[in-house]
Amino acid sequence: KKLFIFVFITLICFGNFFYGKTTIEKNKKVKATFLDYNIKIVSPKISINRFFQNEEPEDTILDLIEISKPNKLENTIFIFPEGVLSNIYLQDIKNYKYIFSNHFSDKHKLILGLNSDENQKIFNSLVVLDNELNIISKYNKNKLVPFGEFLPYENLLSKFGLKKITQGYKSFSSDNKRKIINLNDISFLPLICYEIIYSGKLINNKKYFDFILNISEDGWFGDSAGPHQHFSHSIFRSIEEGKNLIRSTNNGISAFINSKGQIIK
């Protein structure tokens, strides 16, 4: 009986090893997409306290622009994290056009996380904007964090004074549509925050996008192993899906990861 258990465990270990090796070898054959764009990941360390303070966002916007160092002559996609402009809703972003248009050109595209308000529902959204802050595309988060983004049994528990952890009195709503965003000659699968942890459940058809994009606010983890664990999930997903992955975080680990799970930058 002991010999059987030993052999069984050994077969499982070797099976996992060879499956992983085969998957990595297969992913070596994935063709790279060569873009006419530079891609800049913007990875600030803006305090999580902003979620609980009614701060004017102009200084934060200027800080993000300074980190971005935009060159108006270069085709560039700037990728900002989730929620860095927590006091601005998508519907109000054009109020700050005068700042953005002074620093970005028509050669630039901006990707960032913003809250959006649609039909009296609030969504955690990833948006693609041009330098005039016109909306090119938008994705609403599918998988929400319980108690962080929504309060389960809200109608009942709110009567006892409970609410979600993040700012605002109202829970976020989830969208049930997984979306591929097409931007000129490239396409990507957008994932917001912990949507990256769902192994094997990102999307059914992997053929129709070039890479995975994950934006996140990791300041909620504080000084813990959380940001490193969250980052590890990104590596696992890139290997499983056989896709390059770009990750932009605030207070976390940002990186370019190739389809073999190797950190390129």
Question: Where are the model-predicted features located?
Answer:
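Enzyme catalytic cores with a strong preference for nitrogen-chemistry domains
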Residues: 1-265
